[in-house]
């Protein structure tokens, strides 16, 4: 297991990306739209992890709702796991409140699932499986 990325919510990626690229020297790995989450994503590698900038593409997206309640900032921490189904089952068996009962396709074609902050001490946790999923690794 390792930290795959930190998700940061922002109203517009263009308004903040220059800080990460110009001020810190990070490079944008890629951007994409994740249709089912109604979000635009920009990934910026940093060491063995990444910063994931999240911009809502719709007023009813989860990121838009987050921004309305809390403003921009850290939205979630993503932990990379080898077997997401097993990790979800273990969390379920230990009483965690799962947002996603089953993994789904997320950014970069990875399998993802979220665990509710009430089970993690207040942090939205994303589980990510990158291997053998849509060519991602």
Question: Residues of each region from the PLM?
Answer:
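Short loop/beta submotifs within extracellular cysteine-rich repeat domains
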Residues: 16, 24-27, 50-51, 59-62, ...
């Amino acid at each position: 297991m390792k930290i795959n990325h930190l998700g940061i919510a922002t109203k517009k990626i263009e308004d903040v990306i220059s800080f990460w690229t110009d001020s810190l020297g990070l490079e944008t790995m890629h951007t994409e739209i994740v249709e089912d989450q109604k979000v635009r994503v920009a990934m910026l590698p940093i060491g063995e992890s990444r910063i994931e900038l999240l911009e809502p593409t719709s007023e009813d997206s989860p990121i838009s709702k987050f921004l309305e309640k809390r403003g921009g900032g850290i939205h979630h921490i993503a932990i990379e796991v080898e077997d997401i189904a097993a990790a979800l089952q273990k969390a379920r068996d230990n009483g965690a409140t799962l947002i996603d009962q089953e993994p789904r396709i997320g950014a970069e074609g990875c399998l993802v699932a979220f665990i509710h902050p009430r089970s993690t001490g207040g942090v939205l946790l994303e589980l990510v499986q990158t291997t053998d999923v849509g060519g991602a690794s």
